[in-house]
């Protein structure tokens, strides 16, 4: 009907432009509710706005203007500026309340839009949504029985086969630089052409896919190369790829050629997984175990010095032109997690006791979700008494069985069963279902986009490199300050052992709590006897695993800290022996985990005590078995406290994650610029003990030679001269030394051996120090040149500064101590060391103009005794001031002269008691130039063939005592 022909037209309501503007403004920003028309327009509607003229500008404001002023004042208040408050009209009163949190994925829950996964910028991704149905096979899937005749196809050389599929490698040496939603668009590759209609078509550029290269080496044979973890050159275990253009009834052979683990469950009956889209659509069949002639073996290739291994199997596709998938384990992607979380929080009953929020963002920007599950508390006191339980999973992206156990755990704890309700009323659950979403998305097996294993970096302080680990640890640390955390468990997968088992930490606290950490795994083994193997549990704390979540949480104070490991294979227990695990089996372990929590925290402690007594019996049996293997017997009074339980267990190793421990990939190049020094290999204990024994043997040999050899100075000089280059020069010096030895013979009786207390002084030098010819001649100084010492009044009258000897390469230099004994002097008493003073006193006594020594007669007088007075040396205290009067008289009247000890060491040996013999200390070599008298008994001798720059001294018939030591 045309509006122009209408006779009963409604009167048009013309609102004030200002009111209309304010109405739309408030409605846009959420401050205007618009419940009823009368509430929307509080101001009266005017047909036209009154024009204010100059004549009526002085009139009082109208009622409308006053209300507008009130609106403007209210809008400026902080309450209205907040976006977290919403005002509601309840019974005529305006009540503010908090705004509901935003939807999980930043959109309304009605439109069904989800946040897409973010990929590294360089990763190509196909635009295809891949999903699989869940299916539990009616019959149990039996292990493959190896016959021993399985073929081992050799790896063909490069360029031999036809490449039918290839993507870019894992970017070894690079690092993560950025991400984008949905990844990069796929580009056409020339080398991915199908040679004929019978060739299979491969694809892995989808979420969690992993296949780098496929090469056709036979009519129906293909060699496959897996992509290593992104930004690394390691960890090839997980595979998941698509195959198209299949032919029914044709035996195809697939061989993966770059696996890195030395052993695998494929040699114990594990089969690969197959998924057929036609079977899923027509028969409702999902993932199932298939394959024949399965063999895991070592091939001829290597990578970075490590051998590579191959996995081969044959298979017949069930349909023609089918789309099939092969996988190492049941895939569970990041999108699968989002779908499961979406379905749970959309349930109104579930959302009442389950709150979901984002813990943090990963390196690529993907959300790491945190679920808080507990029943609402009626009062604050009840809520404060609740204890906490922390459960995490999927820190290793290739261990998808951990996600399936997590799915079973969430299905049970969020259900409406009475046991689940009791758990929610008793505990607060903090759940992180996927710790490493980036690795899951790109198809890694063990690492994140940092190129490192997250389960080795719980102690790291690099928040930006390991955000999920850092925030998870901070969350637990904050939770511990608020309430007690009775259990922490991280769900994992294991590739070398069957069944399900746990790794824990031995308690080192009070003896009453011993073995308590083993009670929960024992209870779990009783709840799942056909899947969980308690004997497979280990509780050893290894230093190489200190960065794991299990040990880090244990050190923070959580006694029951575990990792629950589920095999990639199946069970070897009970009626499930030699059968594969299905997704339903893995989810059932999550149910059993919750049942065990109820048993462990039951107020009735009868189960707890029964398990503890059984544990004591099992441990005693293990001890007896261990003692029997060692050939020892146990005493009757033997207790568990007499041994360390860790000694009974083997290592929990089975993974090579330590190879991916260290700095993130983007910091490795930076660190190498600052630290170029080559890392030294750490020696084992056996190597260290061997080196220690050899070093001690060499030191003992040197000490023995220093004590037994009668001429140490000549021996050292001989060794030093033999090292010089030139045969003639070497022979001349050896002849010269031999000639000198003939002229200056030494008797065995005139040599003083080294004291046992001086043994350590010879071990400071790494190499034997050489002694010059000049020093050797000084050591051979005859006693007749010294004569009798009667008085030295003017020697060392002033205090002089002692200059320390310079060290040689950080080693203490050998010091020469010469003890000159007259024939009429008594021997030195034992326990009294010679006076040690620096610098050496004999450097200036040599007369360079001739070969004969001269000694000043005016220095030594026969009318005074040396012991009549004490005298000071340069920089040290007097030595004779403490001698008693009787002893002094004996010394003065003694007709037997005393010994004279001359020492060259800069260190002064101080004793509690004063010296008992008079000593003379020479403070400076300047006082000895021309002081010593000429010898009366020794004739003048000259050494032919010896230059004057190295003076030699004649032999004497008097007693000579020469002592060379190293201090």
Swiss-Prot record:
Note on cofactor: Binds 1 zinc ion per subunit.
EC number(s) from the headed UniProt entry: 3.4.17.-
All copies of domain Peptidase M14, residue ranges: 330-601
GO molecular function: metallocarboxypeptidase activity; zinc ion binding
GO biological process terms on file: protein side chain deglutamylation; proteolysis
Chain positions covered by the region annotation Disordered: 679-706, 944-967
InterPro entries registered for this protein in UniProt: Cytosolic_carboxypeptidase, Pepdidase_M14_N, Peptidase_M14
Record's GO cellular component terms: centriole; ciliary basal body; cytosol
Amino acid composition bias (Polar residues), ranges on this chain: 946-967
Principal subcellular localisation of the protein: cytoplasm
Keyword Metal-binding: yes
Cofactor: Zn(2+)
Principal EC category: hydrolase
Keyword vocabulary terms for this entry: Carboxypeptidase, Cell projection, Cytoplasm, Cytoskeleton, Hydrolase, Metal-binding, Metalloprotease, Protease, Zinc
Catalytic-site annotation from UniProt: 565 (proton donor/acceptor)
KW Aminoacyl-tRNA synthetase (keyword) present: no
CDD domains, A to Z: M14_AGBL2-3_like (cd06907)
Subcellular location: Cytoplasm, Cytosol; Cytoplasm, Cytoskeleton, Microtubule organizing center, Centrosome, Centriole; Cytoplasm, Cytoskeleton, Cilium basal body
Annotated catalysed reactions: (L-glutamyl)(n+1)-gamma-L-glutamyl-L-glutamyl-[protein] + H2O = (L-glutamyl)(n)-gamma-L-glutamyl-L-glutamyl-[protein] + L-glutamate
Binding site residues for Zn(2+): 396, 399, 492
Function: Metallocarboxypeptidase that mediates deglutamylation of target proteins. Catalyzes the deglutamylation of polyglutamate side chains generated by post-translational polyglutamylation in proteins such as tubulins. Also removes gene-encoded polyglutamates from the carboxy-terminus of target proteins such as MYLK. Does not show detyrosinase or deglycylase activities from the carboxy-terminus of tubulin. Metallocarboxypeptidase that mediates deglutamylation of tubulin and non-tubulin target proteins. Catalyzes the removal of polyglutamate side chains present on the gamma-carboxyl group of glutamate residues within the C-terminal tail of tubulin protein. Specifically cleaves tubulin long-side-chains, while it is not able to remove the branching point glutamate. Also catalyzes the removal of polyglutamate residues from the carboxy-terminus of non-tubulin proteins.
Family: Belongs to the peptidase M14 family.
The protein's name: Cytosolic carboxypeptidase 2
UniProt source species: Xenopus tropicalis
């Amino acid at each position: 009907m045309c509006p122009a022909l209408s006779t009963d037209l409604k009167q048009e309501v013309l609102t004030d432009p200002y009111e209309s503007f304010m109405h739309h403004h408030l409605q846009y920003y959420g401050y205007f509710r618009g419940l009823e028309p009368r509430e929307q327009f509080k101001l009266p509607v005017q047909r036209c706005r009154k024009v204010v003229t100059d004549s009526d500008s002085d009139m009082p404001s109208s009622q409308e203007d006053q209300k507008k002023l009130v609106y403007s004042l209210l809008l400026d208040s902080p309450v209205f500026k907040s976006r977290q408050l919403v005002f509601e009209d309840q019974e005529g009163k305006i009540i503010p309340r908090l705004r509901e949190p935003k939807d999980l994925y930043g959109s309304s829950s009605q439109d069904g839009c989800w946040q897409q996964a973010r990929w590294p910028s360089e990763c190509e991704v196909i635009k295809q949504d891949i999903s699989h149905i869940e299916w539990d096979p009616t019959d149990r899937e039996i292990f493959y029985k190896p016959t021993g005749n399985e073929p081992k196809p050799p790896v063909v050389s490069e360029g031999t086969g036809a490449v039918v599929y290839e993507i870019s490698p894992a970017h070894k040496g690079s690092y993560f630089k950025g991400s984008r939603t949905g990844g990069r668009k796929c580009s056409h590759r020339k080398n991915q052409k199908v040679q004929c209609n019978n060739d299979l078509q491969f694809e892995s550029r989808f979420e969690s896919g992993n296949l780098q290269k496929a090469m056709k080496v036979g009519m129906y044979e293909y060699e496959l190369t897996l992509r290593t973890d992104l930004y690394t050159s390691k960890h090839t275990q997980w595979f998941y790829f698509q195959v198209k253009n299949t032919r029914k009834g044709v035996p195809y052979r697939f061989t993966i050629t770059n696996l890195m683990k030395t052993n695998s469950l494929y040699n114990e009956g594990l089969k690969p997984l197959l998924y057929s889209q036609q079977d899923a659509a027509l028969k409702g069949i999902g993932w199932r175990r298939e394959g024949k002639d399965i063999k895991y073996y070592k091939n001829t290739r290597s990578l970075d010095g490590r051998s590579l291994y191959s996995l081969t199997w044959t298979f017949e596709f069930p349909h023609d032109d089918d789309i099939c998938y092969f996988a190492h384990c049941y895939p569970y992607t990041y999108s699968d997690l989002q779908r499961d979380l979406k379905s749970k929080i959309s349930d109104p009953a579930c959302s009442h006791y389950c709150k979901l929020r984002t813990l943090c963002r990963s390196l690529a920007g993907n959300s790491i979700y945190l679920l808080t599950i507990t029943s609402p508390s009626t009062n604050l006191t009840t809520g404060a008494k609740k204890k906490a339980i922390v459960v995490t999973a999927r820190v290793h992206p290739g261990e998808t069985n951990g996600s399936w156990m997590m799915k079973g755990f969430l299905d049970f704890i969020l259900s409406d069963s009475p046991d689940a309700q009791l758990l929610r009323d008793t505990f607060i659950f903090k759940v992180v279902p996927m710790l490493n979403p980036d690795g899951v998305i790109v198809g890694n097996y063990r690492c994140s986009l940092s190129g490192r294993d997250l389960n080795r970096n719980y102690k790291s302080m690099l928040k930006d490199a390991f955000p999920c680990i850092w925030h998870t640890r901070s969350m637990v640390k904050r939770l511990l300050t608020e309430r007690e955390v009775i259990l922490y468990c991280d769900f994992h997968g294991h590739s070398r052992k069957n069944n399900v088992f746990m790794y824990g930490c031995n308690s080192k606290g009070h003896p009453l709590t011993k073995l308590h950490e083993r009670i929960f795994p024992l209870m779990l083994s009783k709840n799942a006897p056909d899947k969980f193997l308690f004997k497979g549990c280990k509780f050893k704390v290894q230093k190489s695993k200190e960065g794991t979540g299990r040990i880090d949480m244990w050190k923070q104070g959580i006694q029951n800290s575990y990792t629950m490991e589920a095999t990639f294979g199946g069970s070897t227990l009970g009626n499930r022996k030699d059968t594969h695990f299905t997704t339903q089996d893995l989810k059932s372990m999550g149910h059993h985990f919750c049942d065990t929590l109820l048993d462990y925290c039951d107020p009735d402690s009868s189960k707890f005590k029964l398990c503890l007594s059984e544990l004591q019996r099992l441990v005693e049996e293990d001890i007896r078995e261990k003692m029997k293997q060692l050939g020892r017997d146990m005493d009757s009074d033997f207790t568990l406290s007499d041994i360390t339980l860790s000694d009974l267990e083997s290592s929990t190793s089975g993974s090579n994650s330590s190879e991916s421990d260290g700095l993130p990939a983007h910091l490795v190049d930076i660190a190498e610029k600052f630290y170029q020094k080559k890392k030294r290999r750490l020696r084992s204990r056996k190597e260290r003990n061997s080196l220690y024994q050899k070093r001690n043997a060499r030191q003992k040999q040197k000490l023995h030679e220093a004590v037994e050899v009668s001429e140490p100075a000549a021996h050292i000089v001989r060794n030093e001269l033999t090292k010089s280059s030139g045969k003639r020069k070497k022979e001349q010096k050896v002849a010269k030394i031999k000639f000198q030895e003939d002229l200056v013979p030494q008797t065995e009786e005139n040599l003083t051996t080294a004291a046992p207390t001086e043994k350590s002084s010879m071990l400071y030098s790494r190499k034997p120090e050489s002694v010059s010819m000049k020093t050797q001649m000084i050591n051979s100084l005859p006693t007749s040149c010294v004569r009798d010492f009667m008085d030295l009044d003017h020697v060392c009258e002033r205090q002089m500064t002692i200059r320390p000897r310079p060290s040689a390469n950080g080693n203490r230099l050998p010091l020469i101590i010469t003890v000159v004994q007259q024939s009429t002097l008594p021997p030195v008493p034992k326990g009294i060391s010679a006076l040690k003073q620096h610098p050496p006193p004999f450097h200036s006594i040599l007369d360079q103009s001739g070969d004969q020594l001269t000694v000043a007669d005016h220095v030594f007088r026969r009318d005074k005794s040396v012991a009549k007075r004490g005298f000071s040396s340069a920089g040290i205290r007097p030595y004779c001031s403490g001698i008693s009067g009787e002893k002094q008289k004996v010394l003065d009247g003694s007709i037997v002269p005393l010994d004279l000890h001359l020492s060259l060491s800069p260190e002064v040996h101080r004793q509690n008691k004063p010296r008992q013999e008079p000593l003379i200390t020479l403070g400076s070599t300047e006082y000895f130039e021309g002081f010593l008298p000429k010898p009366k008994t020794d004739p003048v001798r000259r050494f032919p063939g010896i230059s004057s720059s190295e003076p030699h001294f004649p032999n004497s018939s008097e007693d000579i005592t020469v002592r060379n030591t190293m201090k």
